[in-house]
Amino acid sequence: MDYKSKVAELIKKHVELEIEAIEKLIEIPPKPEMGDYAFPCFQLSKVMRKAPNMIAEELKNSMSTDGFERIENLGPYVNFFVDKGVFAENTIKKALEDGENYGASNIGEGKTVCVEYSSPNIAKPFHVGHLFTTAIGNSLYKMFKKEGYNTVGLNHLGDWGTQFGKLISAYDRWVDEEALEKAPIDELLRIYVKFHEEAEKDPSLEDEARANFKALETGDEKATALWTRFRDLSLKEFERVYNILGVKFDSLAGEAFYNDKMDVVVNELKEKGLLVESNGAQVVMLEEYNMPPCIVLKGDGASIYATRDLAAAMYRKKTYDFHKCVYVVGTPQALHFKQVFKVLELAGHEWAKDCVHVGFGLVKFADRKLSTRNGSIVLLDDLLREAVEKTMEVINEKNPELENKEEVAKKIGVGAVIFTYLKNSREKDIVFDWKEILSFDGETGPYVQYSYARGNSILNRGKECTGTVDYSKLSSKEEFELVKSIANFNSVITLALDKLEPSILTRYVIEVAKGFNKFYNAHSVLNLEDEDLKATRLNLVKASLQVIKNGLELLGIDVVEKM
């Protein structure tokens, strides 16, 4: 058990609050002299009808100090000072015993969480914006799993719409079969762009495209075969990119999957008297909720995104009976999801409150020097390739004899990019600056990976140590601060999931790496006459690395053993 839980259980014996509520109230004091954990008593004053200061004093006097150095009250706070030796022993032992499971809990046992993320459009290339949803969603997916939830990763592919009618027309006229097999997305994009250029000169192409899409909607054999081919070729290409990123999904049910599930939604909304006609379209009025109408059917009877998202939500609830369904989609779609969730609520689905939109910002470049295949969008392939190439330049300059250079460059380069996406609050825009991203100093992915490799080197050189571990020897400020950081791992994961904010975990991993380097720079680990102290510090190094490795894994980043 971590000390935060121990503090919470101690308080629980004396107050009428649930353990989860107590844990959320517990704070880390700003100064070490104020204790290691603090419990504010403001919330109890209404219930207990006493001043917070008085409650704090009463709690302090009634608590056992077993496992603590001391417990004090300071104003409205109860401050807990842990027994450093016992604390270090409990924390480090748990980290080493749990290994890759350190930080895990069973808080989500028996509950299912759906996470929708990535969701690219078929026949279009991944651009840098796609990595935002993919990185955030992948990290949330991994964290929910770590907390014991049955987690379902959903890739809601953009695999339906009028663009497929255009693609069929373009395919019939201009496709290069060899290019299509070799680089499918590039070729499909080329003929799609060509279609728009030609349609400006010959508007009848648009009519033909509409007819093609109508044929696809009615199950025409040729149109369906081409659509299936476009989808399969695109998925193969997407899979290649997902493999580079180490991302997997449990379902690839895209927009097309819900084609036969939308009539049920429309009929339900009609039966419940929610659908009204507006300018020929069928809409749900949301004016009293300060939102524009939610269009369910267009004037020509065609469905739109909202209809599909309503159908998807209902299908997911029926199929997975989710505890929570998280949609990782850009912030500009916030209104769309508010409308969809409100329509679900008005239709009587109380579980609409369990649907959550997780928005994120834009991706910008500090110098726009990233090489691209066209001026308007930066392709993800180009970004990742350049990251790996620039990392290789650094390796060749600093350690040209390094083994497995290509593999190391890939892990550091791709990891640096993912780390940048997850470093700051997700709603903030990202500004890419290669110099900063690939720096081995500061708050970057390479800095954290370098810290891990540095620690690994220490462990390899300390293998012959014969000392006996004695945690009471870890008495310095740097050692204790590092142990405290290690102990906070599970609380950080819980908070990151509570806020649906992976950057909380990213900042924590940086904090552990910094704490490890601070400790190592202040204290010798290997050059010690005291073998027992050496053995104890080696265990502290091992526990630090376990946390860094587990933390990076939850962010979707690999560690590098040597660099």
Swiss-Prot record:
GO molecular function terms attached to this record: arginine-tRNA ligase activity; ATP binding
Entry's Gene Ontology BP terms: arginyl-tRNA aminoacylation
Domain of life: Bacteria
Location within or outside the cell: Cytoplasm
Its EC number(s): 6.1.1.19
Reactions catalysed: tRNA(Arg) + L-arginine + ATP = L-arginyl-tRNA(Arg) + AMP + diphosphate
Pfam families, per database record: Arg_tRNA_synt_N (PF03485), DALR_1 (PF05746), tRNA-synt_1d (PF00750)
Protein's UniProt keywords contain Transferase: no
PROSITE patterns assigned: AA_TRNA_LIGASE_I (PS00178)
SMART domains documented for this protein: Arg_tRNA_synt_N, DALR_1
Keywords: Aminoacyl-tRNA synthetase, ATP-binding, Cytoplasm, Ligase, Nucleotide-binding, Protein biosynthesis
Protein name: Arginine--tRNA ligase
Source species: Clostridium beijerinckii (strain ATCC 51743 / NCIMB 8052) (Clostridium acetobutylicum)
